[in-house]
Regions:
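Mobile-element integrase/transposase regions
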Residues: 5, 9, 13-72, 81-84, ...
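Short, conserved catalytic/metal-binding motifs centered on acidic residues
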Residues: 44, 70, 103-106, 131, ...
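RNase H-like two-metal-ion nuclease catalytic core shared by retroviral integrases
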Residues: 105-106, 117-118, 136-160, 176, ...
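Two-metal-ion acidic nuclease core segments, chiefly of the RNase H-like superfamily
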Residues: 119-138
Length: 241
């Protein structure tokens, strides 16, 4: 009886350890995503700093990355507004030479008005208009699921090392963005693709035939009727003009 009791205790402990091991693996292990040429790009924002016209300025930085070739594009703005979001997409598409079939995003306020159950979203009307203009599909990650767009999450960290630590003082934001665009293209030629024995530029050359034409930039303006005050002032976004 004592022998059987010890065997039962051992069996229970072994099963417990196996369950903990299995649950731990399922909780922290993720299957890498594979992408076809022209299938997808990923987008995200970050905050970084640069010296512009002798002043250290905090910038909102748009990051775009093709999921197949890993060609990345970075552009800086003063704010994360719709107009700047639209501008970032157009410049990235132009640099890549076309548009993939879908874009992968988190639930940023300029794209999603309300996060619902599962993958259901109330998509912002202006963002939806941009997506319709460029003819790609928008896909949104689950909340707090950064691994679903892991490439662009990594690109934010890589950009700080490859770009922002080396950026010289600039006379203007336009000059900074010109420098960033040129540096991104140079890095495509210099950097090896993470899973293939070739450069990012070589992978992009193979991907470009699968991209849709960019066409005309999306005109994202919104017309609003405003009341002029007796002193000839109007209020827009809590600022008087």
């Amino acid at each position: 009886m004592l022998f059987r009791s010890r065997v039962a205790v051992f069996a229970r402990e072994w099963r417990r350890q196996q369950l903990e091991s299995t649950h731990g693996a399922s909780k922290h292990t993720y299957i890498p995503l594979q992408f076809s040429p022209g299938e997808a790009f990923q987008f995200d924002w970050s905050e970084d700093w640069a010296v512009i016209a002798d002043e250290r300025v905090k910038l909102q930085v748009a990051h775009c990355k093709l999921s197949y070739s890993h060609a990345f594009f970075v552009r800086a703005y003063p704010l994360q507004t719709h107009e700047m979001l639209f501008d970032a997409h157009y410049h990235a598409f132009t640099a890549w030479g076309g548009i993939p079939q879908r874009g992968i995003y988190d639930n940023m306020k300029t794209a999603v008005d309300k996060v619902k159950r599962g993958k259901q979203r109330d998509v912002n009307a202006r963002f939806a208009a941009m997506v319709s203009h460029y003819l790609f599909d928008a896909e949104f990650c689950n909340p707090a699921a950064g691994w679903e767009k892991g490439q662009i999450e990594k690109n934010v960290q890589d950009a700080r090392r490859r770009l922002w630590q080396k950026v010289p003082e600039m006379p203007s934001l336009t000059a900074l963005n010109d420098w960033l665009a040129a540096r991104c293209v140079a890095l495509w030629h210099e950097s090896t693709h993470p899973t293939e024995a070739r450069t990012i530029q070589a992978a992009l050359d193979d991907e470009r035939p699968f991209l849709m034409p960019t066409g005309q930039p999306f005109d994202g303006f919104v017309a609003q009727t405003k009341r002029i005050s007796p002193t000839s002032l109007l209020t827009f976004e809590r600022t008087r003009y």
